Amino acid sequence: MSDDASTPAAERIPNKGKLAKDLNEVIRYTLWSVFKLKDTLPEDRAGYADEVQELFDQLAAKDVTIRGTYDLSGLRADADLMIWWHAETADQLQEAYNLFRRTKLGRALEPVWSNMALHRPAEFNRSHIPAFLADETPRNYISVYPFVRSYDWYLLPDEDRRRMLADHGKMARGYPDVRANTVASFSLGDYEWILAFEADELHRIVDLMRHLRGSEARRHVREEIPFYTGRRKDIGELVAGLA
C-alpha cells in the first residue's frame, strides 16, 4: 500500500477512477540504481553508450522499461549517474542490473546505492497512482529518496493518519507540475518507502520539498536520506558529459 495521500494533485485524466482501479491490480517492481565512476573515462568513449543502448533495447523487448538515465554529477561527491527501471518481476530487474554491470560502461562504474520497490494501492487514497505506473511522460529532473515512518505511525488511529496525509496532500496542490512516485519497499531493503519526484524545473522540486516541511505528518518521519537528484539525459549525452 502506498503511504501517500501526500503527493501533488493528479493531472486531469479522463476516466481516472477506472484507470486507478485497473492499475492498482498491477504488480510492477521498480529500481533506482546509483553509480560513481571508478576513474575518469578515456577521451575515446566510442562504444560505451552504444553498448548500453543496445542492452536497453533488448530489455525493452522483455518488458523491462528504462524510465530514465540521470546525471547526478556535482550534486553529490559520491555519485555520477542513476538508472531508473521497472518491470513485472524483481528477477527481471536483478538480471537487467547485472547485464548493465557487464557492459564497458558498467565495468567503469562502482555501485553506490540501489533500492527496489513496488506499487501497492494507497491506504487512504486509492486514486493515487505513481507517475511511472500511469505511463506519464518522464520529466527533466528527478529527486529520489527513501523514508521510514516513526515507530508509532502505524499504531495511530486510522482517522488521525488519514487526516494528516490528506492535509499533506492539500499542501502540495500548488505544485501539480511536480509528479510523484511513492512506492513500498518494506523488506526489500532498509526502508519502508521510496519516493521520486519528477519535474521539468528543478526549483519546483526544491520549493515543494521545503513547503512540505511544514506538514504535521513530518513529525512521523524518522529517516529520509540519502537524496539523489539529477537531470534526465539519454545515455549518449550522459556518457559524453561524464568526467
Curated annotation (Swiss-Prot):
UniProt keyword list: Heme, Heme biosynthesis, Iron, Metal-binding, Oxidoreductase
Reaction(s) catalysed (UniProt annotation): Fe-coproporphyrin III + 2 H2O2 + 2 H(+) = heme b + 2 CO2 + 4 H2O; Fe-coproporphyrin III + H2O2 + H(+) = harderoheme III + CO2 + 2 H2O; harderoheme III + H2O2 + H(+) = heme b + CO2 + 2 H2O
UniProt xrefs under InterPro entries: ChdC/CLD, Dimeric_a/b-barrel
Cleavable signal peptide: none
Cofactor note: Fe-coproporphyrin III acts both as a substrate and a redox cofactor.
The keyword Heme is assigned to this record: yes
Positions annotated as active site in the UniProt record: Y145
Cofactors that this protein relies on: Fe-coproporphyrin III
Pfam families named among the record's database cross-references: Chlor_dismutase
GO molecular function, one term: metal ion binding
Residues reported to bind Fe-coproporphyrin III: H168
GO BP field: heme B biosynthetic process
Pathway(s) where this gene product acts: Porphyrin-containing compound metabolism; protoheme biosynthesis
This enzyme's EC code(s): 1.3.98.5
Record-stated family: Belongs to the ChdC family. Type 2 subfamily.
Function comment: Involved in coproporphyrin-dependent heme b biosynthesis. Catalyzes the decarboxylation of Fe-coproporphyrin III (coproheme) to heme b (protoheme IX), the last step of the pathway. The reaction occurs in a stepwise manner with a three-propionate intermediate.
Official protein name in the record: Coproheme decarboxylase
The species this protein was found in: Streptomyces coelicolor (strain ATCC BAA-471 / A3(2) / M145)
Gene name of the encoded protein: chdC
